[in-house]
A protein has these predicted regions:
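Interfacial loop at the N-terminal end of multi-pass membrane proteins
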Residues: 1-42, 85-104, 121-124, 131
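Hydrophobic alpha-helical membrane-embedded segments
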Residues: 1-2, 64-82
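Hydrophobic alpha-helical transmembrane segments of polytopic
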Residues: 32-39, 58, 62-65, 142-145, ...
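Interfacial segments of alpha-helical transmembrane regions
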Residues: 49-69
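Intrinsically disordered, low-complexity cytosolic loops and termini enriched
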Residues: 104-113
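Individual transmembrane alpha-helices with interfacial aromatic-anchor signatures
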Residues: 123-148
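Juxtamembrane boundary at the C-terminal end of a transmembrane helix
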Residues: 154-162
Length: 162
C-alpha cells in the first residue's frame, strides 16, 4: 500500500534502505496536508449545508476523521515511530555527514528529528527493516482513517440522490 515494499525487498543493505525510506517519507508533507485541509473544510461545509440529519452526521464524521490524521501524526507518530526511524537513519548515515536538527511538537518536520529518548533507544537496538515495517503498519492506520472518511462523505453525498 506504500512505497515500503520495494525498499525492504530490494535494498542491498541498511544504509540504502535508510536513504530510500527517508526520501519517500519526506514526500509525505508535500501532499498529505494539502489533502487534509481542504478535505476537512469541504466536509464541514457540506455538513453545514446538508439537508438531512444523517447526511450532516456523516459529513461531520468524515471531517473529524480526516482531520484526526494530523494529531495522530504529530503527537503519536512523530515522537514514536517517525522519530525512531529518523534516528536510525541518522545513526546509519552519520559517517556520511548526515544529521538532523531536533524539532518540537510545535514545529513538526520530516526534515528534523522529533523522537523521544525512548524511541531513540528503541531505534538503536532495532534493525532498519523492522522499523520500516512497523512504520508501515502504523501508517496504514492513517490510510484506514482516510478510507473511513471517504466512505462517510461518499455515503452522505449519494444518500439523497434519487
Amino acid at each position: 500500500m506504500t512505497f515500503v515494499e520495494p525498499i525492504i525487498t530490494h535494498a542491498p543493505n541498511e544504509k540504502v534502505m535508510a536513504k530510500q525510506w527517508l526520501h519517500g517519507y519526506q514526500y509525505g508533507p508535500l501532499w498529505v496536508p494539502p489533502l487534509i485541509g481542504p478535505g476537512t473544510l469541504a466536509n464541514l461545509f457540506l455538513a453545514y449545508t446538508a439537508q438531512s440529519q444523517m447526511q450532516r452526521i456523516a459529513y461531520i464524521v468524515a471531517a473529524l476523521s480526516i482531520f484526526s490524521i494530523l494529531p495522530i501524526t504529530f503527537f503519536y507518530m512523530e515522537p514514536g515511530i517517525n522519530g525512531a526511524t529518523k534516528w536510525k537513519v541518522q545513526m546509519l548515515l552519520k559517517d556520511e555527514g548526515f544529521g538532523m536538527k531536533d524539532t518540537t511538537v510545535w514545529y513538526p518536520s520530516a526534515h528534523r528529528q522529533g523522537g523521544t529518548l525512548a524511541s531513540r533507544r528503541w531505534a538503536e537496538r532495532t534493525g532498519m527493516k523492522e522499523l520500516i515495517l512497523f512504520w508501515r503498519r502504523v501508517n496504514n492506520w492513517r490510510w484506514g482513517i482516510a478510507f473511513l472518511a471517504a466512505v462517510a462523505s461518499g455515503w452522505a453525498t449519494f444518500s439523497e440522490v434519487a
